[in-house]
From Swiss-Prot:
Protein location: Cytoplasm
Similarity field: Belongs to the DnaA family.
Protein name: Chromosomal replication initiator protein DnaA
Source species, domain of life: Bacteria
Lineage: Bacteria, Pseudomonadati, Pseudomonadota, Betaproteobacteria, Burkholderiales
GN (gene name): dnaA
Annotated source species: Paraburkholderia phytofirmans (strain DSM 17436 / LMG 22146 / PsJN)
């Protein structure tokens, strides 16, 4: 059993990033192997880690166990029996009056995530920072923060007791102003979250709601997203200084969420004690409503105004919600004034989001706004190859090119198609070939081919530029007609399976060289002209529905 685990750990260490290996694999330990039942039990130090490893790595570990013992092995994950002894404080829940109000936007965390009192959170964070900075002053910092924690807990106990039942599901792990400032002052560049104990690292992920798998290392970069990635890295290296706020926009499944999680994960690794929060805009709206109903706005504001990095996803969901927008405006102003970083995503350019207050739009425009475009062919192929590699599947490049050529809209669609191919191949016991891929994706390819036609592209483009559809076929050459016609040709080449001669025929019998010239011209200008790039983005999203 131990020989297997050494073999398994060595393989996983080579396959995963150092951060992933140290965080998820290193804390595991094999505890039993039942040869009669072919069952292997692996212990995890806590429930959070157990659930994550089970969902992400159980299949790979089972495959390695099968190869090692030359038979199917049932891999079971259990809690380390010693875990309870390492955390005695968690055994006795605090009385209701001493529990903190709960965090807005708790997204599936364990039930015990908010079990520590508010001030203890500040003490832990500052103590982590003090230890990472060196032993000098660590004891004093801890003593001072413990005193502050006790005072804060006593001061707020009566007020919170009355509201404890009503605000329990807000889960606000807040600090008072002094604690937040103390935690912020104790940061040192280069302090790594990974150097803390495993329990502390888990707690950071639970509080921040970050997905530790979404990092810069596994983000596939191409022309469509290279500017966004460069801006994200710059912000991760200089939070609150470079590009504040950073506003990323683009269609569904293009990597916006991946990038902002990558920023959060990088900062969490670089600065111990960083107060980071990822939240979807819908959850933020829900928490504003709960805070209003439970009269818990003081806790709500204290929590959000003391963050060091706020990552808010899909802010278009704020549309028409004036109270939410007002609260977010105040939080935004407080964070920027404190040199905290704000990062926002949307499916639309800021000025085109309907129902958003002009004050917020102007704040969004005050930083850096970057579009993420649908991935180009080479990038789509790279995404498929990377995803197949992560699933430990050998994917022929011809198959990847076939899928990438036919599915153009976003990364999620590509990954979903690959999962479908893998399942089809496994179920039928057939090697993954182009023929198998066509069978697996038959319905999806039919829908794709039916969705966008050259005729629809011509009509949509003509409407967008206020010309007649007939102008698409005519021989007229004024700039206000020729330009939209070239754009429509470019979109026809990008969004359909038509050949250049076929496209030329549908544009009034034009030669294929005319179409090729238009495609190359628009593609070149798109990379240099932000306005044209934005117009094409709008047209593509309209055509894809």
């Amino acid at each position: 059993m131990n020989d297997f685990w050494q073999h398994c750990s060595a393989l996983l260490e080579r396959e995963l990033t150092p951060q992933q290996y140290v965080t998820w694999i290193k804390p595991l330990a094999p505890v039993a192997f039942d040869a009669a039942a072919n069952t292997l039990s692996i212990a995890a130090p806590n429930r959070f880690k157990l659930d994550w490893v089970k969902s992400q790595f159980s299949g790979r570990i089972a495959d390695m166990a099968r190869d090692f013992w030359q038979a199917p092995v049932d891999v079971q994950f259990v809690l380390d029996p010693k875990a309870g002894m390492r955390a005695p404080a968690a055994a006795a829940p605090a009385p209701a009056s001493a529990r903190p109000a709960s965090a807005p936007g708790s997204m599936g965390g364990s039930a015990g995530n908010g079990a520590a009192v508010d001030a203890a959170v500040g003490a832990v964070q500052a103590a982590q920072a003090a230890r990472a900075a060196g032993t000098n002053g660590a004891n004093n910092a801890m003593a001072n923060l413990n005193a502050n924690a006790r005072a804060a807990a006593e001061q707020n106990a009566n007020a919170r007791a009355a509201a404890a039942d009503d605000s329990a599901d807000l889960d606000l792990p807040s600090l008072d102003a002094n604690e937040a400032a103390a935690a912020r002052r104790t940061w040192r560049p280069g302090q790594s979250a990974s150097s803390n104990g495993n329990g502390e690292t888990d707690s950071m992920y639970e509080r921040s709601k970050l997905n530790p798998v979404l990092t810069f290392d596994n983000f596939v970069t191409g022309k469509a997203n290279q500017l966004a990635r460069a801006a994200a890295i710059q912000v991760a290296d200089n939070p609150g200084i470079s590009y504040n706020p950073l506003f990323l926009y683009g269609g569904v499944g293009l990597g916006k969420t991946h990038l902002i999680h990558a920023i959060g994960n990088q900062l969490l690794m670089d600065k111990a004690g960083a107060r980071i929060r990822y939240i979807h805009a819908e959850q933020y709206v829900s928490d504003v409503v709960k805070a209003y109903q439970r009269k818990a706005f003081d806790d709500f504001k204290r929590y959000y105004h003391s963050l060091d990095l706020l990552l808010i996803d899909d802010i278009q969901f704020f549309s028409g919600k004036s109270r939410t927008q007002e609260e977010f405006f105040y939080a935004f102003e407080a964070l920027v004034a404190n040199k905290a970083q704000v990062i926002i995503t949307s499916d639309t350019y800021p000025k085109e989001i309907s129902g958003i207050d002009d004050r917020l739009i102007s704040r969004f425009d005050s930083g850096l706004t970057v579009a993420i475009e649908p991935p180009e062919l080479e990038m789509r192929v790279a995404i498929l190859m990377r995803k197949a590699q992560s699933e430990f599947v050998s994917l022929n490049e011809d198959v990847a090119f076939f899928v990438a050529k036919h599915l153009r809209s976003n990364v999620r669609e590509l990954e979903g198609a690959l999962r479908k191919i893998l399942a089809y191949s496994k179920f039928h016991g057939r090697e993954i070939t182009i023929e198998v891929t066509k069978e697996a994706l038959k319905d999806l390819l039919t829908v794709q081919n039916r969705q966008i036609s050259v005729e629809n592209i011509q009509k949509t483009t003509a409407d967008f530029y206020s010309i007649k559809v007939a102008d698409m076929y005519s021989k007229k050459r004024p700039a206000n007609i020729a330009r939209p016609r070239q754009i429509a040709m470019y979109l026809a080449k990008e969004l359909t399976q038509k050949s250049l001669p076929e496209i030329g025929e549908l544009f009034g019998g034009r030669d294929h060289t005319t179409v090729l010239h238009a495609v190359r011209k628009i593609a070149d200008e798109r990379s240099k002209d932000a306005q044209l790039n934005h117009e094409l983005h709008v047209l593509e999203q309209t055509l894809k529905g």
